[in-house]
């Protein structure tokens, strides 16, 4: 580490960059070159030094370097980074300490670094004003660009701008050089942007290029320069670019899916959208214009006559739009279709294909490109209801299926995949920055340590001489490090630290070592490293606001606050050292919370920090605070005693000498949990301080009696005081004079009388009841504001005004009293108080300006009072925090978004503005600019904003009509993809990430909450007291009632004892042990006095044990990890006590950490109670009933009781039988189905009606019977404790009541009718019967509390906008309409209400009416906001708002244009934030639920989980028998040809080509094209048939064993049949070309063969994995739709047909209702369906209209029912169910990506088996050893082993069975081990795979391996050695013999013998060689004994196998 700091950091580390420095660098470079002449590039990159990331150009200088000497600012200095030691660079630092790095070579070949010109340029460049100037220029330039038609003088301004930019570039080029070296001008990509902008400016100026406006738009790119100037933006842009890269796979998949769907659409709907209703041609001859003149010369009775005949021209007639049928107010003619379920034409019209397509001809499926556009529109769900309605009208309702598929698979899946990918890219980016930061931190820490050690050593030498303190300095040293180090943490960094902590926790759990022991963890924000002044922040809840304390001396607390940060299970607080030694409880989670500054236990034994007992695990909060606060409470700081205040309330824990209980005799702390007697801003009141001082200080003094203790304490104290003083100085933000000023003027404590007054006021204002009262006032005030409406009576208005004055008074009084009680200085130290002050001031200002016109907006500031609720409402607090947190992170993103919006708005204005003006008549009938145009900047901005909201198609049609298709498509698509899909998804990703579970931890313990809770507690206590008194009174007056007395006694007792406990805050253990009761009143710890102290709990938690956040005893982290370990079993007197306390702990621990629920666990936490599978029914009644009414107790042993019991048992058996259940399910389905028939035609179908009536009775009787049976069988107790049974019960009741009413003849009563509609709930009973749905519903029920919570918060949030809307728009939406034409009168004709009334008096056609959805009261305001937030129907509301003038005035076109901004702001906060918050909460909640269910997917049943797991690991495949190669030579050749990969791929290419030819088809193609296409198609059919035939020849009957082949076969047959019978099929079925589209499915197969397609495979795999869960959610959605459809039919069947309700889309029949509801599932078009239902009285509708064929009168709707119906449906389907869908996809996507990231994927295993099949054709699962080498080489990477691989294979030590065979699993394991390396996971995988393999292959004979390859090799080698030895021995013997013979026959032919001997030796050698080769080749080289053992076994198995085969045949 020391090496990275080249120079010791500090001010002396800077040196001027001089010629000598340059020479030195050159010398070093030369030396290096001499050392290695050819540097190895690669090597260098890998292992060489890296540039120090802290010293990068553009970053600020780390503050470890101290201040820069002023003479060195803006001067060239030597580079500080050791990496650049031999590179020609130097750095320059400006005043802000920013680092600029320059190349030391000559710029432009002439300017050396020492050239005065270059020096000046550098000075200018690094000056902060320079970038400011550029920034201002850019902004001014942007303002000029927004001018739509700029005046002439702006030309000169343009030149000025160009000049400034040129100047900037020149300065940069002179200072940096142009492009050759590093750090020159063009090396920075952002400068390329400048360069191009400037070049274009000059080019357009001097060269005439024709279309200048297009080029002028390039100037817009200058806005992008802001990005390069603002540092934070670059990172966000980086993230954006990353996510776009990541999106490539999704984009490919999306385009592919859309193409497939577009092809299907093309085939299905080609030309359909041109079907129009055309008038029947009249018979008279007046239609001359449509007739063709023909001159006919004919022979008439022999005389030639010339006659002119008129013939009718059909074609031109049908094209004439005058004869088409138009609905009023619609631009396009009415569509129709010729199929029975399509739209019909009115009388006198016929359906003909004529004219152009709808929407200027842009909406159609006529060619592939238009179809693709339509599908893209469907996918982004923009105005798709229109496309849906048009298509269904033209083609028929059955085609709804097509839309269902596209919406669910295309839209939901693909769009959310984009979200998932963007979110993951963001997450990765985050991870990277976190890791980098962590690394930096470690380095930085080491530097600090070094510096500090020196300083400390010096200090310590002076301070103490005693050897006994040798250990302290290090501790103190660390403390002071922290003091100078802990910069203020931003909330973001706190979050980052939390994330890091999580990561580290995971690492440690997975067996990490304690390597980051005393690593000091600190915020990552770059600037925090370089802050000069350090301030400590108490990091209480996730948000870090600073708190100041009641006296300047309390800085101690601030150390405590940050050092011992009170976060729960804080893994690393700001500052954490782990006791490195033999830490007793080191395996626990809080090991590094030991803030002990002592290194090992021995030293802790008698230290100030009282060590804890072995294995005792405390809640982390306790462990931290106990230690820390004891350390601080022991010595008075500056003579005053202060207890520690942390944000969890005040915990003052003091060590006292308690009885040594543990064998070791360690001291145990006594723990007292004090209630936070703190006022709002955390200051401790005087009285409390006094009390606490007296109560706790003496204990610690006793503790310190021991001299050694005292001495040690004092030494620590001194060191701490030093630290503290340093801290104090460093914490002060302002110059000291300000502190003096504030001490004198802002702290009022001069006169003692005043102090008394202050004290009294303090007691009053700080009382919890006052808080409660204020909260109630806030709620009341909000109600008062929400009561405003239009029209209001004078009196009501007066009441509201007075109310407002009263509330303003109350809040003002509160503020002033608080200021008196707290002093202004401390009052304004707290966020909430500043907020209060701000609001009060505004209210007072508003009262003053009440009568000023146009300032009514100030009234809306009152609404901010609502936010005061956040103090006492955790969820709201959390929401505001999340918005706060994300605004930080989103700030940059919002800027980027703003820049993008700006750029596109300007581009649009420049490119299309003129066209809108010129061609306006094309898009507007009156030739006036429409509302949405691009002629000026504001409107252009609105269009871009609208596109971001997802509405692009309508504005794009207009644009395409006026400005040409290509340009408009390009611009709009870019905005859509860049802005909407990427940036907005990044927005969502950020929101979701700030939503991570820890943020939701039911808001962190906030002392603010306590006040309310204390107040509520007191009320509870008061009530309990009154009850007790009443009981006592009763007891005295009626002595007889002894029983009551007995019941009350324990309660009474408990209360008395509690009072004792309360009175004495410092509970001494001996005396008050009996106070220690847990909530049930059982004493929990009399046994030993050991861990009792922890449970001394005071007042309020008796009542609110769980929901009192100030009590930090009970916050285990999750249900799975409660504090059982805390409770040492010996502490409990009995088993039962232990159990009980465990239960208590469990209850408290599930105080639902991660959810937004505040109290208790979610309702449906327990799985649904199923009746036990015993055949004995349970008791009928509850215990209570039996005790009260003795008659319920029946003996079942004899007589009637026995008969009754037998009856119950019989019933129980019946009910438990599967058939019974099946029958009931069948009945439920039938009765639900029956409801679907009750549509408007039921009265005309008499027989069906009668049948239904009888059926209804039958069903009711059956269900009643079922209910009775269950009552008898299960007993009331079981029946009525099951939620599902209650559901059944209520639904049966409804049927029963309506049945009785019918029998009594009351069926026409209104109440009974509405009850009948409740029968629609019948299908709900199916829920409990279908497991799949029940699972989803349980998950949903679990989420309901948090969903409701968020819903409430959203409502509060929206309330503010709603009240504001009422303030702005109430009564202003009224307008005067001409009832005949429906047009609004001009202002010139009608100016106000009275004018309109005059018109009405004169003639009847005018009417003064309101917009249906308006802001006249808060309720309607909510409805309007919902329409705006879902972007449906928002246009009408916005138009009305923008046109409004004032109450009772006629609106004028775009009168108050800037009202658009109200909606823009609402959309950003109300829609983007709150609706996405919904998604966040739901996803978060399901993850919570998932954890609870043990990480399993909660949307799946057991069966589906099995499927899911099978999908997850396909590794369970066994080697299959390949299709045997046919013996016939010709067949064999074909077989080889067909089975090659090339053949497959070529077929795929053919399929794609076939698709292309299908894409070429259009609706209006000529006959010539049609014939060519049909021929091409014929060729394809021949080719595919050929493929089919070839495969049939080669694969024989095996062809049909493969699914894909059957699929191909069917398609081919269909194509052939289709070719011959095309006409017939066209007529009766869908067009046969569709079957060709299905072939595309085969492309899925090819993905496996393409290496690059891995990403796409992952995406498809994620889809496959999501299917089971998505199916369940789909089922639930269907059920909801079904119920709502039936409800809709019974309520809205006869509504007037207008707006969205017409002859096809209505609630008249079940089918139509379903079609409507499907469309609303995505919230599309619900405003249109709601509008007619809001008609409640004439003249909007006619209540007496007769509906033919029905007894119902009138066509009015029921507004309240309608609003409830639609709003509830949207919340259920759109917000909840659809978001569940998203949650599943996100989840599975992350799982799938994790899977694909593993080194070995399923595909690799599959490839292994595919290759295996070739080597093991009989699927024996074994392979001979000699084949193995080839096999290993044949595999594909990563498993393959290229030859030569014999040695590697031998080294793998593979087990072999007889016959030298190796099992496939063993090989697979060995190979995977090679890829993954040795690890524990490997063994787990092995076991898993073996189990799976055994399961899938019961046939695997468990051959015992006899040997292994390694053993075999060793045996072979040994054999060779033995043989050699033996041969040598032989040889020796022979030689001996030979020599003996030789000696004998010495004289006879000696020479001859020598030759013989040579030959002999040669022969022996030869022999051994052949044997050697033999050995390696031989396979039977194992000793005979082995063979003998295994042969019979093997033979036996082989024989068995043959027998089995024979049997099989």
From Swiss-Prot:
Known catalytic reactions: Na(+)(in) = Na(+)(out)
Membrane topology per record: Multi-pass membrane protein
Cystine connections: 277-345, 336-351, 921-927, 959-968, 1376-1396, 1741-1756
Domain spans labelled IQ: 1915-1944
A Pfam family of this chain: Na_trans_assoc
Molecular function GO terms recorded: voltage-gated monoatomic ion channel activity involved in regulation of presynaptic membrane potential; voltage-gated sodium channel activity
Gene3D superfamilies membership: 1.10.287.70, EF-hand, iswi atpase, Voltage-gated potassium channels. Chain C
Segments of skewed composition (Basic residues): 495-506
GO BP of this protein: adult walking behavior; cardiac muscle cell action potential involved in contraction; detection of mechanical stimulus involved in sensory perception of pain; determination of adult lifespan; establishment of localization in cell; membrane depolarization during action potential; nerve development; neuromuscular process controlling posture
Composition bias type Low complexity, residue spans: 456-466, 479-492
Residues that span the membrane, as ranges: 129-146, 153-177, 189-205, 214-235, 246-269, 398-423, 769-787, 798-820, 831-849, 855-874, 892-912, 966-992, 1219-1237, 1251-1276, 1279-1304, 1314-1332, 1346-1369, 1458-1483, 1542-1560, 1572-1593, 1602-1623, 1637-1655, 1666-1688, 1760-1788
Changes seen on gene knockout: Homozygous mice display severe seizures and premature death on postnatal day 15. Mice show severe motor deficits, including irregularity of stride length during locomotion, impaired motor reflexes in grasping and mild tremor in limbs when immobile, consistent with cerebellar dysfunction. Heterozygous mice exhibit autistic-like behavior, characterized by hyperactivity, stereotyped behaviors, social interaction deficits and impaired context-dependent spatial memory. Defects are caused by caused by impaired GABAergic neurotransmission.
Spans of repeat I: 110-454
PANTHER family assigned: SODIUM CHANNEL PROTEIN TYPE 1 SUBUNIT ALPHA (PTHR10037:SF280), VOLTAGE-GATED CATION CHANNEL CALCIUM AND SODIUM (PTHR10037)
Role description: Pore-forming subunit of Nav1.1, a voltage-gated sodium (Nav) channel that directly mediates the depolarizing phase of action potentials in excitable membranes. Navs, also called VGSCs (voltage-gated sodium channels) or VDSCs (voltage-dependent sodium channels), operate by switching between closed and open conformations depending on the voltage difference across the membrane. In the open conformation they allow Na(+) ions to selectively pass through the pore, along their electrochemical gradient.
This protein's name: Sodium channel protein type 1 subunit alpha
Organism per entry: Mus musculus
Gene behind this protein: Scn1a
């Amino acid at each position: 580490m020391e090496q990275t700091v080249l120079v010791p950091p500090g001010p002396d580390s800077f040196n001027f960059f001089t010629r000598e420095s340059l020479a030195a660098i050159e010398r070093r470079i030369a030396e290096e070159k001499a050392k290695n002449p050819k540097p190895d590039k690669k090597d260098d990159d890998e292992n060489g030094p890296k540039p120090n990331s802290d010293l990068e150009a553009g970053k600020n200088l780390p503050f470890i370097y101290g201040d820069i000497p002023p003479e060195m600012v803006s001067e060239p200095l030597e580079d500080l980074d050791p990496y650049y030691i031999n590179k020609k660079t130097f750095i320059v630092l400006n005043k802000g300490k920013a680092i600029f790095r320059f190349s030391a070579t000559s710029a432009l070949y002439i300017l050396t670094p020492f050239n005065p010109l270059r020096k000046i340029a550098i000075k200018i460049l690094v000056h902060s004003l320079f970038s400011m100037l550029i920034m201002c220029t850019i902004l001014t330039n942007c303002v000029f660009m927004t001018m739509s038609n700029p005046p002439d003088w702006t030309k000169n301004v343009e030149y000025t701008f160009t000049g400034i930019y040129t100047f900037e570039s020149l300065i940069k080029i002179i200072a940096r050089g142009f492009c050759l070296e590093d750090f020159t001008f063009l090396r920075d990509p952002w400068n390329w942007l400048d360069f191009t902008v400037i070049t274009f400016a000059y080019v357009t100026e001097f060269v005439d290029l024709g279309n200048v406006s297009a080029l002028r738009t390039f100037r817009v790119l200058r806005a992008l320069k802001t990005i390069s100037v603002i540092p934070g933006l670059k990172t966000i842009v980086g993230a954006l670019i990353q996510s776009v890269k990541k999106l490539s796979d999704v984009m490919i998949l999306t385009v592919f899916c859309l193409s497939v769907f577009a092809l299907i659409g093309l085939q299905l709907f080609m030309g359909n959208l041109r079907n129009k209703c055309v008038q029947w041609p009249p018979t008279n001859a007046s239609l001359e214009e449509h007739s063709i003149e023909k001159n006919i010369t004919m022979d008439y009775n022999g005389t030639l006559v010339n006659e002119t005949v008129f013939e009718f021209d059909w074609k031109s007639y049908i094209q004439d739009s005058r004869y088409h049928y138009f609905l009023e107010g619609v631009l396009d003619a009415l569509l129709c279709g010729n199929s029975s379920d399509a739209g019909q034409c009115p009388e006198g019209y016929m359906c003909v294909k004529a004219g152009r397509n709808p929407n200027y001809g842009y909406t159609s499926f006529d060619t592939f490109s238009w179809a693709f556009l339509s599908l893209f529109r469907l996918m982004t769900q923009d105005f798709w209801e229109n496309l849906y309605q048009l298509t269904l009208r033209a083609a028929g309702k059955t085609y709804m299926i097509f839309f269902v598929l596209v919406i669910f698979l295309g839209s939901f899946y693909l769009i959310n995949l984009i979200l998932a990918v963007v979110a993951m890219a963001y997450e990765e980016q985050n991870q990277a920055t976190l890791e980098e930061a962590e690394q930096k931190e470690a380095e930085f820490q080491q530097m600090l340590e070094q510096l500090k050690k020196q300083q400390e050593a010096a200090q310590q030498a002076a301070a103490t001489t005693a050897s006994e303190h040798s250990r302290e300095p290090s501790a103190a040293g660390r403390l002071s490090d922290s003091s100078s180090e802990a910069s203020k943490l931003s909330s973001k960094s706190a979050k980052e630290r939390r994330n890091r902590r999580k990561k580290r926790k995971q690492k440690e759990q997975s067996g990490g070592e304690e390597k980051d022991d005393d690593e000091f963890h600190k915020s990552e924000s770059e600037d925090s490293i370089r802050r000069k002044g350090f301030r400590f922040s108490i990091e209480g809840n996730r948000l870090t606001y600073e708190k100041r304390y009641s006296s300047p001396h309390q800085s101690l607390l601030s150390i405590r606050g940050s050092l011992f940060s009170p976060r729960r299970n804080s893994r690393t607080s700001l500052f954490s050292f782990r006791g490195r030694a033999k830490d007793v409880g080191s395996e626990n989670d809080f090991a590094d919370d030991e803030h002990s500054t002592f290194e090992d236990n021995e030293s802790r034994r008698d230290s100030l920090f009282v060590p804890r007992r072995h294995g005792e695990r405390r809640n982390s909060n306790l462990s931290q605070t106990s230690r820390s606060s004891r350390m601080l409470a022991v010595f008075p700081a500056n003579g005053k005693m202060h207890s520690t205040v942390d944000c969890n309330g005040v915990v003052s824990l003091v060590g006292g000498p308690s009885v040594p209980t543990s064998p070791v005799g360690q001291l145990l702390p006594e723990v007292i949990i004090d209630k936070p007697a703190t006022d709002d801003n955390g200051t401790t009141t005087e009285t409390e301080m006094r009390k606490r001082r007296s109560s706790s200080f003496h204990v610690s003094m006793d503790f310190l009696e021991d001299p050694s203790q005292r001495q040690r304490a004092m030494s620590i104290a001194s060191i701490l005081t030093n630290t503290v003083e340093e801290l104090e100085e460093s914490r002060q933000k302002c110059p000291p004079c300000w502190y003096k000023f504030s001490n004198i003027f802002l702290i009022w404590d001069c006169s003692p009388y005043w102090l008394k007054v202050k004290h009294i006021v303090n007691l009053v204002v700080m009382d919890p009841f006052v808080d409660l009262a204020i909260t109630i006032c806030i709620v009341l005030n909000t109600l008062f504001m929400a009561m405003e409406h239009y029209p209001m009576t004078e009196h009501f208005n007066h009441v509201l005004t007075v109310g407002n004055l009263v509330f303003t008074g109350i809040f003002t009084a509160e503020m002033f009293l608080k200021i008196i009680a707290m002093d202004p200085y401390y009052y304004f130290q707290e966020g909430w108080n500043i907020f209060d002050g701000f609001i009060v001031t505004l209210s007072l200002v508003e009262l003053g300006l009440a009568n000023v016109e146009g300032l009514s907006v100030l009234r809306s500031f009152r609404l901010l009072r609502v936010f005061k609720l956040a103090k006492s409402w955790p969820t709201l607090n959390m929401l505001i925090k999340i918005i706060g947190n994300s605004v930080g992170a989103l700030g940059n993103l919002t800027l980027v978004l703003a820049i993008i919006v700006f750029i596109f708005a300007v581009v649009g204005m420049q490119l299309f503005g003129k066209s809108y003006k010129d061609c306006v008549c094309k898009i507007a009938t009156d030739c006036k600019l429409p509302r949405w145009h691009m002629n000026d900047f504001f409107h252009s901005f609105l269009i871009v904003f609208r596109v971001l909201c997802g509405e692009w198609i309508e504005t794009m049609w207009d644009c395409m009509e006026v400005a040409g298709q290509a340009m408009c498509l390009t611009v709009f698509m870019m905005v859509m993809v860049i802005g909407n899909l990427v940036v907005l998804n990044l927005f969502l990703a950020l929101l979701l990430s700030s939503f991570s579970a820890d943020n939701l931890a039911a808001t962190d313990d906030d002392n603010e909450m306590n006040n309310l809770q204390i107040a509520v507690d007191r009320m509870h206590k008061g009530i309990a007291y009154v009850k007790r008194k009443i009981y006592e009174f009763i007891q005295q007056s009626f002595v007889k009632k002894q029983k009551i007395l007995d019941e009350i006694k324990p309660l009474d007792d408990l209360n008395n004892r509690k009072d004792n406990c309360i009175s004495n805050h410092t509970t001494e253990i001996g005396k008050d042990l009996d106070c220690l009761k847990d909530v049930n009143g059982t004493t929990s710890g009399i046994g030993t006095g050991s861990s009792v102290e922890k449970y001394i709990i005071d007042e309020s938690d008796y009542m609110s044990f769980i929901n009192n956040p100030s009590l930090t005893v009970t916050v285990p982290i999750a249900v799975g990890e409660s504090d059982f370990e805390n409770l040492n079993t010996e502490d409990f007197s009995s088993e039962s006590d232990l159990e009980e306390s465990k239960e208590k702990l469990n209850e408290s621990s599930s105080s639902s950490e991660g959810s937004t629920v505040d109290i208790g666990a979610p309702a449906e936490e327990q799985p649904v109670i199923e009746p036990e599978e015993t055949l004995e029914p349970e008791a009928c009644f509850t215990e209570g009933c039996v005790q009260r009414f003795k008659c319920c107790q029946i003996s079942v042993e004899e007589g009637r009781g026995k008969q009754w019991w037998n009856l119950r048992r019989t019933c129980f058996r019946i009910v438990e039988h599967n058939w019974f259940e099946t029958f009931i399910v069948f009945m439920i389905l039938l009765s639900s189905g029956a409801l679907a028939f009750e549509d408007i035609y039921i009265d005309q179908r008499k027989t069906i009606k009668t049948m239904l009536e009888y059926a209804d009775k039958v069903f009711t009787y059956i269900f009643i019977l079922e209910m009775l049976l269950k009552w008898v069988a299960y007993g009331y107790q079981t029946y009525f404790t099951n939620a599902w049974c209650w559901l059944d019960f209520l639904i049966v009741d409804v049927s029963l009541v309506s049945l009785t009413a019918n029998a009594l003849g009351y069926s026409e009563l209104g109440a009974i009718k509405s009850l009948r509609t409740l029968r629609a709930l019948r299908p709900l009973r199916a829920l409990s019967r279908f497991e799949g749905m029940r699972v989803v519903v349980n998950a949903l029920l679990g989420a309901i509390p948090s969903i409701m919570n968020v819903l409430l918060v959203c409502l509060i949030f929206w309330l503010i906008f709603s009240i504001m809307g009422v303030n702005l728009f109430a009564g202003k939406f009224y307008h005067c309409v001409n009832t005949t034409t429906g047009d609004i009168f001009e202002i010139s004709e009608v100016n106000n209400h009275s004018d309109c009334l005059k018109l009405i008096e004169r003639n009847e056609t005018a009417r003064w009416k309101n917009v249906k959805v308006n802001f006249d009261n808060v309720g309607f305001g909510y409805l309007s906001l919902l329409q705006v937030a879902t972007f449906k129907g928002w246009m009408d509301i916005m138009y009305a708002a923008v046109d409004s003038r004032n109450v009772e005035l006629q609106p004028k076109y775009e009168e108050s244009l800037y009202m658009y901004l109200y909606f823009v702001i609402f959309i950003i906060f109300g829609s983007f934030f709150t609706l996405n918050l919904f998604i966040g909460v739901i996803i978060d909640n399901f993850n919570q639920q998932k954890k609870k269910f043990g990480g399993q997917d909660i949307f799946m049943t057991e069966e589906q989980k099995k499927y899911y797991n099978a999908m997850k690991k396909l590794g369970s495949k066994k080697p299959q028998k390949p299709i045997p190669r046919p013996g016939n030579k010709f067949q064999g050749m074909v077989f080889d040809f067909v089975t090659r990969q090339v053949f497959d791929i070529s077929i795929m290419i053919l399929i794609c080509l076939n698709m292309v030819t299908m894409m070429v088809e259009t609706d209006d193609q000529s006959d010539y094209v049609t014939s060519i296409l049909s021929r091409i198609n014929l060729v394809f059919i021949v080719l595919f048939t050929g493929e089919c035939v070839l495969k049939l020849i080669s694969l024989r009957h095996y062809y049909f064993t493969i699914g894909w082949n059957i699929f191909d076969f069917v398609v081919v047959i269909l194509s052939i049949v289709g070719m011959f019978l095309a006409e017939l099929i066209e007529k009766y079925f869908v067009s046969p070309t569709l079957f060709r589209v299905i072939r595309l499915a085969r492309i899925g197969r090819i993905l496996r063969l393409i290496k690059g397609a891995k990403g796409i495979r992952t995406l498809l795999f994620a889809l496959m994995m999501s299917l089971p869960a998505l199916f369940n959610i789909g089922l639930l959605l269907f059920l909801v739709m079904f119920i709502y459809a039936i409800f809709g039919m019974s309520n809205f069947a006869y509504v007037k047909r207008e707006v969205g309700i017409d002859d096809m889309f209505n609630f008249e029949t079940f089918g139509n209702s379903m079609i409507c509801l499907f469309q609303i599932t995505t919230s599309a078009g619900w405003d249109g369906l709601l509008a007619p239902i809001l008609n409640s009285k004439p003249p909007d509708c006619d209540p007496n209209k007769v509906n033919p064929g029905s007894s119902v009168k009138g066509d009015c709707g029921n507004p309240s029912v309608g609003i409830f119906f639609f709003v509830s449906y949207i919340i259920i389907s759109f917000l909840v169910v659809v978001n569940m869908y998203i949650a599943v996809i996100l989840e599975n996507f992350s799982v799938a990506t994790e899977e694909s990231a593993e080194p070995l994927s399923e595909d690799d295993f599959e490839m292994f088996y595919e290759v295996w099949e070739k080597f093991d054709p009989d699927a024996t699962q074994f392979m001979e050893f000699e084949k193995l080498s080839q096999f290993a080489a044949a595999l594909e990477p990563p498993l393959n082993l290229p030859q030569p691989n014999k040695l590697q294979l031998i080294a793998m030590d593979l087990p072999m069975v007889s016959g030298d065979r190796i099992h496939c699993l063993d090989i697979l394991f060995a190979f995977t081990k090679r890829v993954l390396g040795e690890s524990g996971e490997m063994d787990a995988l092995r076991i898993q795979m073996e189990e799976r393999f055994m399961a899938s292959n019961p046939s695997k004979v468990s051959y015992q391996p006899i040997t292994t390859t390694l053993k075999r090799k060793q045996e072979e080698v040994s054999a060779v050695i033995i043989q050699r030895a033996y041969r040598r021995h032989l040889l020796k013997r022979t030689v001996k013999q030979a020599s003996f013979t030789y000696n004998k026959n010495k004289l006879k032919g000696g020479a001859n013998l020598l030759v013989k001997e040579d030959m002999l030796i040669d022969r022996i050698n030869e022999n051994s060689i052949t044997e050697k080769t033999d050995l390696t080749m031989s396979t039977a080289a194992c000793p005979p004994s082995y063979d003998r053992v295994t042969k019979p076994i093997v033979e036996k198995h082989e024989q068995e196998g043959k027998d089995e085969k024979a049997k099989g045949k």
